C-alpha cells in the first residue's frame, strides 16, 4: 500500500566551483571533497554512490572532509576550503533564499535521482478502512498551517505536500546499498 511521504524530494549532488579546474566527477580523484555527515543520505551516501558510479573509491580516491552539516559543507565549498563537495538541493534552495547563492556560483558534476524521504508507515495488520482513512488525511493535510518545528519533524521545512509513495521509490536506495557494499545487518 502506498503511504504518504514528503514532496519535493531532495537531490544529492557532487559540486565544485567554476574555477576549480574540475570538469567531471572522475577528475575529483586526489582532490578534497566535503561530505556533510557520515550518517547523511543526501550528504554522504548518495554523493559517495555517485563517486563510485564514476569509478572512484570514495574511501581511497578522494580526500574526504566531513564538514558536520549540509550548511558547513556548502560553506566549505563556497569559500574554496575544499575542491569539491556535496550540495543537496534543499541546502541549495536555503542558500538561494538567504541570498548566499546565485546561479553560476557552483558547477554540478553529478546529480542523484530524487531521494525518497522517510515514509509514514502503517502496521499491516490494522483494518484496511483505517489505513485508507489515515492515508487520505495525510495526503490532504494543509502543510501551510504547520509551524516550522512540526515541518522539521516531518522531514524538513522545504516540503510542500505529502504524496503517495510506493516500494519501487526505494530501488535507488537498494542499488546504493549494493554499490557501496553496505552491510545492513551491521546497521541494525
Model features per residue range: what roles?
Residues 1-21:
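Short, glycine-/small- and polar/acidic-enriched structural segments
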Residues 19-23, 51-54, 84, 155-168:
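Short, exposed beta-strand "edge-strand" segments with a Pro/Gly-rich flavor and a Y/T-containing core
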Residues 20, 31-129, 136:
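Pocket-lining segment of extracytoplasmic ligand-binding domains
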Residues 23-24, 133:
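Short, charged, surface-exposed loops that flank catalytic or proteolytic processing sites
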Residues 27-29:
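Well-ordered alpha/beta subsegment
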Residues 1, 104-107, 146:
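N-proximal short alpha-helices
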Residues 122, 126-188:
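An extracytoplasmic/periplasmic, membrane-proximal ligand-sensing/linker region
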Residues 8-10, 44, 61-67, 92, ...:
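Broad hydrophobic/π-residue packing in well-ordered secondary structure
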Amino acid at each position: 500500500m502506498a503511504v504518504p511521504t514528503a514532496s519535493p524530494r531532495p537531490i544529492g549532488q557532487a559540486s565544485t566551483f567554476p574555477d576549480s579546474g574540475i570538469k567531471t566527477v572522475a577528475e575529483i580523484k586526489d582532490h578534497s571533497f566535503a561530505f556533510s555527515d557520515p550518517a547523511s543520505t543526501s550528504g554522504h551516501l548518495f554523493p559517495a554512490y555517485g563517486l563510485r558510479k564514476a569509478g572512484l573509491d570514495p574511501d581511497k580516491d578522494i580526500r574526504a572532509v566531513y564538514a558536520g552539516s549540509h550548511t558547513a559543507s556548502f560553506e566549505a565549498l563556497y569559500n574554496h576550503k575544499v575542491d569539491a563537495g556535496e550540495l543537496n538541493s534543499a541546502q541549495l534552495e536555503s542558500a538561494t533564499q538567504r541570498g548566499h547563492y546565485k546561479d553560476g556560483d557552483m558547477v554540478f558534476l553529478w546529480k542523484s535521482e530524487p531521494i525518497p524521504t522517510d515514509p509514514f508507515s502503517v502496521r499491516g495488520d490494522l483494518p484496511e478502512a483505517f489505513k485508507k482513512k489515515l492515508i487520505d488525511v495525510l495526503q490532504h493535510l494543509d502543510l501551510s498551517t504547520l509551524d516550522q518545528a512540526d515541518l522539521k519533524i516531518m522531514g524538513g521545512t522545504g516540503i510542500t505536500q505529502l504524496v503517495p509513495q510506493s516500494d519501487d521509490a526505494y530501488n535507488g536506495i537498494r542499488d546504493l546499498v549494493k554499490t557501496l557494499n553496505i552491510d545492513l545487518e551491521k546497521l541494525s
